[in-house]
Regions:
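Solvent-exposed beta-strand/loop surfaces of large extracellular or lumenal domains
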Residues: 167-192
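C-terminal beta-strand-rich structural cap/linker in extracellular carbohydrate-active enzymes
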Residues: 158-160, 189-199
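Aromatic (Trp/Tyr) and acidic
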Residues: 1-163, 171, 183
Length: 199
């Protein structure tokens, strides 16, 4: 039930870390579906927008009267707290947010996997060639992202885009032309010459 699930912030982070490692080992996007859900639905709710208060547990529904002392849910707080007796959540949240780049991308030699559609810029080296990758968009409020891959010279490489399990009519345009590609373990993989590409 929504009012009695525990959804501990640190347990959610552990789930995300496990999912990330499994996805990286198996190259299976279903793990990143779990990671994405954990990050958006629990981790981000565990910290206030100003970063000064936190939830230890994150039930989906809270009735303040049921959180009073000497009730079965007195450990649940109806508002975020500035600190806890056991304060693992605040540093764990900030550490996870600081390492978000490791969740967005995986790299294996000349292959780059785009796992999370979070606006960002990063630099990678594919086959010895420096590339700048830029993701632009307003996910999850909008369902369109632009991914720019900008290399200093042309090289053979592969870029894999995660197809979220909830995505309907997912398609990729490469330099304005629709790609006719098949899905492999939840990723659409595009291989070949890469230089200055827009997806």
């Amino acid at each position: 039930p929504n009012d009695s699930n525990y959804s501990e912030t640190c347990a959610t982070i552990a789930l995300a870390m496990f999912g990330k490692r499994m996805a990286d080992m198996e190259k299976d996007a279903s793990y990143m579906d779990v990671v994405e859900r954990a990050l958006y639905n629990t981790l981000l709710s565990g910290i206030a927008m100003d970063g000064k208060s936190f939830f230890y547990v994150n039930p989906l529904e809270v009735w303040p009267v049921s959180c009073m002392p000497r009730t079965s849910r007195e450990h649940v707080k109806p508002v975020r707290q500035k600190w806890f007796g056991v304060a693992c959540c605040p540093p764990n949240i900030t550490r996870t947010l600081a390492s978000l780049g490791q969740y967005i991308y995986f790299q294996e030699e000349n292959e780059i996997y785009v796992n999370l559609y979070v606006a960002n810029e990063t630099e990678v080296t594919l086959n010895g060639v420096p590339f700048k990758i830029t993701l632009k968009g307003n996910f999850p409020w909008e369902n369109k992202m632009t991914v720019s891959v900008d290399g200093v010279q042309e090289t053979e490489a592969m870029i894999a885009f995660r197809v979220p399990a909830y995505a309907e009519n997912f398609k990729i345009l490469r330099n304005g032309k629709e790609e006719n590609l098949t899905e492999d373990h939840g990723y659409i993989k595009i291989s070949g010459k890469m230089y200055k590409e827009t997806f």
